[in-house]
Regions:
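Bacterial signal peptide processing site
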Residues: 25-28
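C-terminal motif of bacterial Sec signal peptides marking the signal peptidase cleavage site
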Residues: 19-23
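Extracytosolic low-complexity repeat regions of secreted or lipid-anchored proteins
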Residues: 89-159
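Short, charged/polar surface micro-motifs in flexible loops or helix N-caps
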Residues: 80-87
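Bacterial N-terminal signal peptides that target proteins for export
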Residues: 2-14
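N-terminal secretory signal peptides
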Residues: 30-80
Length: 159
């Protein structure tokens, strides 16, 4: 067999295998938020970590989004509607306040409070720790301008 034919066959097989293996963790389909073109979201996106809760970052198909894990267990969207006052619990992790919505548990939805634009993170709590995930995302999200903070009910009723 001619060396050119062998080389061509090797290159073809290598390319097909490479495409097949890379396709196992393809692009995560997401929808951009209404304010995803806000320049502040670009500041967040370029700072997103390569790993979150030991899960590798994945490519997404929407502006100002991020995803980690195969299958994706953490989804981030910047530019979501800025939340107003709420009765949902608010947790502060490393100077970033997050509203916690557990109405679809084990999927937990965390939305920044007091940051414009707002960031939403959906976490599969059966795959990763919510606290660890928010700690890992904190440095990227904390670049957003802080406009207010969570308050406790005791803050409301102080004399």
């Amino acid at each position: 067999m001619n060396i050119r034919i062998r080389l061509l066959g090797f290159v073809t097989v290598t390319a097909v295998l490479g495409l097949g293996l890379s396709g196992c963790a393809g692009v995560v389909p997401m929808k951009p938020a209404e304010d995803s073109n806000n320049p502040e979201c670009a500041n967040v996106t370029v700072r997103l970590p390569d790993t979150v809760s030991d899960l590798a970052k994945r490519e997404t198909n929407a502006q100002a989004t991020g995803a980690w894990g195969t299958p994706a267990a953490v989804l981030l969207t910047c530019g979501v509607e800025v939340p107003g006052p709420t009765i949902l619990p608010c947790v502060s992790i490393n100077d970033v306040d997050w509203i916690e919505d557990d109405s679809q548990a084990p999927l937990y939805r965390y939305t920044t409070y007091g940051r414009t634009p707002a960031v939403e993170v959906v976490i599969d709590s059966e795959a990763v720790s919510g606290t660890t995930t928010l700690v890992d995302l904190g440095p990227a999200v904390s670049v957003l301008p802080k406009t207010s903070q969570c308050i406790d009910i005791t803050d409301v009723f102080k004399n």
